[in-house]
Amino acid sequence: MSERHLPDDQSSTIDPYLITSVRQTLAEQSAALQNLSKQLDSGQYQRVLNLIMNCKGHVILSGMGKSGHVGRKMSATLASTGTPSFFIHPAEAFHGDLGMITPYDLLILISASGETDEILKLVPSLKNFGNRIIAITNNGNSTLAKNADAVLELHMANETCPNNLAPTTSTTLTMAIGDALAIAMIHQRKFMPNDFARYHPGGSLGRRLLTRVADVMQHDVPAVQLDASFKTVIQRITSGCQGMVMVEDAEGGLAGIITDGDLRRFMEKEDSLTSATAAQMMTREPLTLPEDTMIIEAEEKMQKHRVSTLLVTNKANKVTGLVRIFD
């Protein structure tokens, strides 16, 4: 790749006004959000929330251009928080994809002007199907608004774009409205972390909320007998690489554990170590986790008791493995 494709960001002088422009844009968008919050029509929002809550089908988003991109995000947020939803492109809908829509679906149509041709072309068909329509627009007197069952206005003075052309403030406001509706539904549906995890099984949260310790535990638990010597205990802790060792009774059951910390504390108070046994050093009745414990519960228990490793037991109370907080 030639040097001209790798410009040195220190070689060019940036006009200080550009930084001022960045600050101004952020300030203007923030002010627009504040203005929307103050001017929103609570009656219209109540109607919209009721329509979403009582929808028996899908909440379908549609918009052209940048409004379409925002609509996709809004749909994804609704779907991931318990409200079945998908996005449909208005042009594709007008050429066959209307077949994806059932009479039980609720449509949210996005158009800042309220006069987007591709959006307006959908309205007669939607009304014929019997669908309810929610309009998100900056023009409460637009054709779209007049044909909607509920209208959420942006109350925007102008776009942040210096030419008042590129969708900037309007997309920010629309995105915020989508998030506000989704959050309201989370409250209404009492949508909890466990519910969220069901729709995000591949993410970190989903793993922690849906995975049990039996699924991730290590089965090879370092162990010593009650009469094991101090030297044997150290060797087993070292070779086991877990920072602890399980102490077994005569029947192979759990008698206790010895951690690195237990060893240090024992060494501080005992003068003679050559005759010490595991029974003298161990912590009796250590904390354990049932195999069906969720990972998130295991993490909470470890953090509460300030430990990094816990033994896992089966229904017969036999040790079957161990789990670490960083597994």
Curated annotation (Swiss-Prot):
ATP binds at residues 63-68. GO terms for molecular function: arabinose-5-phosphate isomerase activity; ATP binding; metal ion binding. Its EC number is 5.3.1.13. Residues 217-273, 282-327 form the CBS domain. It comes from the Bacteria. The keyword ATP-binding applies. The keyword Nucleotide-binding applies. The record marks 66, 118, 159, 200 as: Catalytically relevant. Residues 48-191 form the SIS domain. InterPro entries: CBS_dom, CBS_dom_sf, GutQ/KpsF_isomerases, KdsD/KpsF-type, SIS_dom, SIS_dom_sf, SIS_Kpsf. Keywords: ATP-binding, CBS domain, Isomerase, Lipopolysaccharide biosynthesis, Metal-binding, Nucleotide-binding, Repeat, Zinc. Substrate binds at residues 82-83, 89, 95, 121-130, 155-157. Belongs to the SIS family. GutQ/KpsF subfamily. This is Arabinose 5-phosphate isomerase KpsF.
